[in-house]
Design a protein with these regions (language model features):
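Active-site neighborhoods of divalent-metal-dependent phosphate/nucleic-acid chemistry enzymes
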Residues: 59, 73-119
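Alpha-helix capping/helix-boundary segments
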Residues: 10, 42-43, 86, 105, ...
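Generic structural signal for small/hydrophobic residues in well-ordered secondary structure
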Residues: 8-9, 46, 90, 109
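Short, well-structured N-terminal submotif of metal-dependent ribonuclease cores
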Residues: 1-38, 54-70, 112, 121, ...
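Active-site regions of enzymes building and remodeling cell-envelope glycoconjugates
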Residues: 127-132
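Short, conserved active-site loops that position catalytic residues or coordinate cofactors/metal ions
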Residues: 40-48
Length: 132
């Protein structure tokens, strides 16, 4: 089974509102048959959005960052970083989607041949395996 990358909303839902995950997404994250990872890009995106207006539907705690990292570490879900090759790949992606965080996550999934857990309707325009 391919490694699975979680997009930012999948990270947030997994950690703070798992009932908002689709059944397929929850199964992929929890089934233990394949490796699951999340991106440092998600922490960056959450930090910027929290500084602006937050996520009113999710009511994140002040220590959201520590809870995400520690919670995923307990589950064996690793964090991946941003590499130069991911930055270069963003340049070559079609402009179907404008959000820079999502574009970087798409590039990471493409470059590493990961499947992606995402409810983003544009994700299938970039990736061949999107789970939701």
């Amino acid at each position: 089974m391919r490694t699975t990358l979680l997009d930012t909303m999948a990270v947030l839902r997994s950690c703070f509102r798992p009932e908002l995950l689709s059944r397929r997404a929850a199964e992929r994250i929890l089934d233990g048959r394949g490796s699951v990872v999340f991106s440092m890009v998600s922490l960056w995106e959450i930090g910027i959005k929290m500084a602006r207006s937050g996520y009113p539907d999710l009511e994140l705690p002040a220590d959201w960052d520590e809870r995400i990292v520690a919670g995923f570490a307990e589950q064996g879900i690793a964090m991946i970083g941003i590499e130069v090759k991911h930055c270069k790949m963003v340049e070559n992606l079609p402009m179907h989607h404008q959000d820079p965080f999502d574009r970087m996550i798409f590039a990471q999934a493409l470059q590493r041949d990961f499947s992606l857990v995402s409810s983003d309707l544009d994700a299938p325009l970039y990736l061949d395996e999107v789970i939701w």
